[in-house]
Amino acid sequence: IRRQRQMCIRDSWDDVIQKISPLASKDSLYLAAETEPDTYKNEKMYSDHPAVMGAIGLFPYNSHQIDFAKMKKTEQWIWKNWKWETSWGWDYPMMAMGAARMGEPENAVGALLMKQQKNTYLVSGHNYQDGRLRLYLPGNGGYLMAVAMMCAGWDGSIHPNPGFPQDGNWDVKWEGLNPLF
């Protein structure tokens, strides 16, 4: 990002970045954490945030740290098996951003429109969670970020409106947005 913005390069930062370990995986699926080898066998691990999708949805794609085929397989497992009723409002935008970066705009839109209680938006703009938690801003902010990314793209995206299906059914208009890093 610093190179793209023509800012000074800090060699010490690049050195640290190159030494970051690749994401932990097992059986060609990325794990929730290196200490959780049973991520996809322990229901507790796939009943909260599908946070592993943040590695490709929220951060710049880096092939040194992320194997695209492995991430795609992980994403497919998550779509098929996740306990969505226990997830949180920001999980849906995070899934949308990951799907968009992986060239799956139908899944990106599907994540934002998934019919789940915690993927509901109130008139106030807040993301409804449950009766005890009436205000929840991470879902709202995530939704705005996901839609902006789906419209303006990200560094390296080449198609207009890359997060929306290019099947002729979408007429997406926007202005003033910048690509995500």
Predicted regions and their residues:
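Non-catalytic carbohydrate-binding regions of carbohydrate-active enzymes
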Residues: W13-E43, S63-F181
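Start-of-helix signal in alpha-solenoid helical-repeat scaffolds, especially tetratricopeptide repeats
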Residues: D48-H49, G89
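Active-site cores of enzymes that catalyze phosphoryl transfer or operate on phosphate-rich substrates
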Residues: V52-L58
